[in-house]
Amino acid sequence: MDFKQYSPEELKECSMIEVVHSVLGDKRQATTFNELVQEIAQVLGLSQEQVNAKIAQFYTDLNIDGRFINLGENRWGLRSWYPYEQIDEEILPQPKPKKKRKVEDDGFDDYIEEDEDFDDADVTEDEDDDVEDLDKVLEDEDGDDDDLDDLDEDEDDFAEEELEYDETEEEEEEEL
């Protein structure tokens, strides 16, 4: 776009985004943000104070507008220049190779496990008492089945009440 053909009034009506789009289209190469701001100021005839007042909104608009893409290192270009696969390659940082650390010797690698046999003679009377206590606990848990039966009955009652409610509701709808 040749900006010389426009009058100063027409240029003031152009938004900064429109100017950047045409500038990038003419250059056909990615440009840093600072260079874009300088060119906009030159084309629109903005003072440094006016540029400073509008720079934050301009940067926001540049990010939001789908026609532009940030290529990293504060360089901007038109999205139409870059196929999707190429964009991924330029934006992704290169992975750094990891340094190999020397493994420290902790002394556990040399331990050889031995099969240890436990005889029944090692069982003490205290352990026998523990087994008997477990038997009592298991017997007590068998008594908890009664509570489950009560819950099943409550669920059956609820299901019957719900069925009756649904039938009553259907009859009322038929009457209408």
UniProtKB/Swiss-Prot annotation:
A Gene Ontology molecular function term of the record: DNA-directed RNA polymerase activity
Domain of life according to the entry: Bacteria
Compositional bias segments (type: Acidic residues): 106-176
Domain annotation HTH HARE-type: ranges: 14-81
UniProt keyword list: DNA-directed RNA polymerase, Nucleotidyltransferase, Transcription, Transferase
Pfam family, one: HARE-HTH
GO annotation (BP), single: regulation of DNA-templated transcription
Keyword Transferase part of the UniProt annotation: yes
Region (Disordered): 91-176
UniProt key word Transferase: yes
InterPro entries found in the cross-reference section: Asxl_HARE-HTH, RNAP_delta_N_dom_sf, RpoE
GO cellular component assignments: DNA-directed RNA polymerase complex
Oligomer status and interactors: RNAP is composed of a core of 2 alpha, a beta and a beta' subunits. The core is associated with a delta subunit and one of several sigma factors.
Known role: Participates in both the initiation and recycling phases of transcription. In the presence of the delta subunit, RNAP displays an increased specificity of transcription, a decreased affinity for nucleic acids, and an increased efficiency of RNA synthesis because of enhanced recycling.
Record family assignment: Belongs to the RpoE family.
Name of this protein: Probable DNA-directed RNA polymerase subunit delta
Gene: rpoE
